[in-house]
UniProtKB/Swiss-Prot annotation:
Record GO biological process: L-histidine biosynthetic process; methionine biosynthetic process; purine nucleotide biosynthetic process; tetrahydrofolate interconversion
Organism: Desulfitobacterium hafniense (strain Y51)
Amino-acid biosynthesis keyword on record: yes
Entry's Gene Ontology molecular function annotations: methenyltetrahydrofolate cyclohydrolase activity; methylenetetrahydrofolate dehydrogenase (NADP+) activity
Main function: Catalyzes the oxidation of 5,10-methylenetetrahydrofolate to 5,10-methenyltetrahydrofolate and then the hydrolysis of 5,10-methenyltetrahydrofolate to 10-formyltetrahydrofolate.
Source organism phylogeny: Bacteria, Bacillati, Bacillota, Clostridia, Eubacteriales
Superkingdom, taxonomy of origin: Bacteria
Protein name from the UniProt record: Bifunctional protein FolD 2
Sites where the protein binds NADP(+): 164-166, 189, 230
Keyword Transcription: no
Family of the protein in this entry: Belongs to the tetrahydrofolate dehydrogenase/cyclohydrolase family.
Amino acid sequence: MAQLLDGKEISKVLKEEIKEEVKRWKEQGVNPKLAVVLVGDDPASVVYAKSKQKVSDSLGIDFELTVLPADSSEESILALIDSLNANPDVHGIMIELPLPKHISKERVMAAVRPDKDVDGVHPINRGYILSGEEGLFPATPESCIEIMLRSGVEIAGKHVVIVGRGETVGKPLVFLILKHNATVTICHSRTPDLGAFTRQADIIVAAVGKAKLVKKDMVKPGAIVVDAGINEIPGGICGDVDFEEVKEVASLISPVPGGVGSLTTALIMKNVLKGITLQRKEGQ
């Protein structure tokens, strides 16, 4: 029976560390601040924004939410981003998705200064992931790494199979794991005989967006299984791993909910603080 990779407990420790770092910045006269931009009134986006505000408040990070009408022009959104980019009191900027259909997501996300891009989606930050340079990286792949390292998992030398090639989790995770000296195989929804690959893995990371895709017979005994999926099913949510089955053969497994997702908001806040350091290097 597998032991849990307990994201909730790790998140508590991480938040305490962030509080201490916020305190140190405030002692230097810097009040860390996150600005969130919401266009329209998508109910899920409103909930996400409010949950970030709650976490932000609890950590001592200032929070500013700007809500623009759904019919806002792209130019008005870009003008707001320009003003936030130029404001030295704003250290992190986040654009809530989805944006209205008439707005170019790519243009808007690329307008955010890379050193304030707490979502880690700016093309320059994506490039930094590949090159190994310091930048702001997406919270979910960082969470997959963090949940393992803080649970005592040795990544170096392991064969890690990532199931999923998405822009926000699968692809960046390849390069973040390579930095930890693992051997990486990436699979996806079109991979024939997926189990032939996952059965070779010391560590499986599932991030493909298919409910309970990874079954017991796809996991070698003693493997570590990290579930970064989140899928709505009748009666709740589940991951990309069939948790009840796979926990019988894995040595460690992250649950959904209560695993990887528990760390993501805290890691966004950590990016706000990392952004301060990057901005100071650039002389703002």
